[in-house]
Amino acid sequence: MRSTYILIIVPLIIIGGGVVADNTNETPVLAHSSDEQPHQRLTYYNWDHKDLGTSAFEDLPPLQDQPTPLPIDQSDRCPDGWLRYSDSCYFIETESLGFAKAERKCHDKQATLFVANSMEEWDAVRDHAEKSVLSWIGLVRFSHYERLEQLPRWQTTGSINPSKINWLIKPFKPVVNGWSSYANCAASFQSPTEVESASYTFFYPCTMAFKSICERNSTILNARN
């Protein structure tokens, strides 16, 4: 019998991360420290492939090759409707989709699901996600390696330790944070309040329909292509 999953919202964290005052026709820029390092050389995990030993994803047509965007630097503007932080652009997807379709929609934008390279990036980007909803991020823990790895896996290597982000239950353990053989994918909830600990990350079945956060980063896309 399939388990029934109930979303329970409890008070957790919001960490502010303002937007630099934007001029009339400029891309919003998320505030960040000057010593922020860009993404390093990365390995990209293509979860659209069916070689991961999981039934979590829906069947989708094969991916089509996408051109790799030019590198993003501090002086570049992101596309309209995107935010910029360091060497990345971010798109807050407001359509509710299953994880696989959310990942595909990011790919169609020449992007990946959001992968945090630092806690500063994690806090700044989440602070501008849609409030009071769950958003897919590029973080999963598949059942085929559950006995070997306690931590979930970001969509690229070289990212922050997943145990450091704001899980619902800390210290991080997979099962108490919703993980099961049917709930492999992590989503982030961003509270509309400024109450400490009002936002959190939790595992859900990958077929549930949530919002999502896309990230366009030239280093990640080079690894993907």
Swiss-Prot record:
Entry-listed glycosylation sites: 217
The record's subcellular location field reads: Secreted
Any one of the GO BP annotations = immune response
The source's domain of life comes to Eukaryota
Q: What is its main location?
A: secreted
Task: Give start and end of each C-type lectin domain.
Answer: 85-215
Could you tell me the keywords of this UniProt record? Answer: Disulfide bond, Glycoprotein, Lectin, Secreted, Signal
Any single GO molecular-function term of the entry would be:
carbohydrate binding
Q: Which GO terms describe its cellular component?
A: external side of plasma membrane; extracellular region
* Covalent S-S links between cysteines: 106-214, 185-206
Range of residues in the leader sequence: 1-21
InterPro entries given for it?
C-type_lectin-like, C-type_lectin-like/link_sf, C-type_lectin/matrix_domain, CTDL_fold
Protein's UniProt name: C-type lectin domain-containing protein 91
Q: Which organism is it from?
A: Caenorhabditis elegans
